Amino acid sequence: MSVINFTGSSGPLVKVCGLQSTEAAECALDSDADLLGIICVPNRKRTIDPVIARKISSLVKAYKNSSGTPKYLVGVFRNQPKEDVLALVNDYGIDIVQLHGDESWQEYQEFLGLPVIKRLVFPKDCNILLSAASQKPHSFIPLFDSEAGGTGELLDWNSISDWVGRQESPESLHFMLAGGLTPENVGDALRLNGVIGVDVSGGVETNGVKDSNKIANFVKNAKK
């Protein structure tokens, strides 16, 4: 497994995050999203209800088994004790852990034995991306997002792409991108240097609720 292909996806990775209903999860699966994300950080507006989390997990596993298509449940955490993360991983059947705090992704990966997506903030965390490129860790994907994450704040894509292009081996730098993505701009995001996947939450919502049409259009535009 490599940083790019541990999910088994042959194209760009598409993650729909902040799911809070089985209906939205079913839409994401039917639209061919690769990764379904649930917020496991307490007291956030998109924090998942435990009952719904288990139902979404069952949907992901049933879809994977029936279709043979790799789909994964991603649990999003932020500066939570490893033991608490492990408890929810086991309870919800989480496949991939996404870390949005100051955690050491290596420590959590070793403790949990799971793939990790690590949120990076540009430009302060560029050294983590460079280190990952040189070490080629297994089952690890960097993710550029805003400091808070889930705010819909549009990142400075051009600065990130320009920075990648200036590096000694730009072809070795791969990461997912989040922050302000929508069905309308996701195609442009995937054409930037280094981007191998996209992560959306608010960009597929209407009045704070996941919108099936927006989810379907986002995935379609990302995959075409």
From Swiss-Prot:
Gene3D superfamilies: Aldolase class I. Coiled coil: none annotated. SUPFAM superfamilies: Ribulose-phoshate binding barrel (SSF51366). Pfam families: PRAI (PF00697). Its EC number is 5.3.1.24. Keywords: Amino-acid biosynthesis, Aromatic amino acid biosynthesis, Isomerase, Tryptophan biosynthesis. GO terms for cellular component: cytoplasm. InterPro entries: Aldolase_TIM (IPR013785), PRAI_dom (IPR001240), RibuloseP-bd_barrel (IPR011060), TrpF_fam (IPR044643). The keyword Isomerase applies. Changing residue 172 to R: In strain: CLIB 556 haplotype Ha1. It catalyses: N-(5-phospho-beta-D-ribosyl)anthranilate = 1-(2-carboxyphenylamino)-1-deoxy-D-ribulose 5-phosphate. CDD domains: PRAI. It comes from the Eukaryota. It is an enzyme of class 5 (isomerase). Pathway: Amino-acid biosynthesis; L-tryptophan biosynthesis; L-tryptophan from chorismate: step 3/5. Present with 1850 molecules/cell in log phase SD medium. This is N-(5'-phosphoribosyl)anthranilate isomerase. The gene is TRP1.
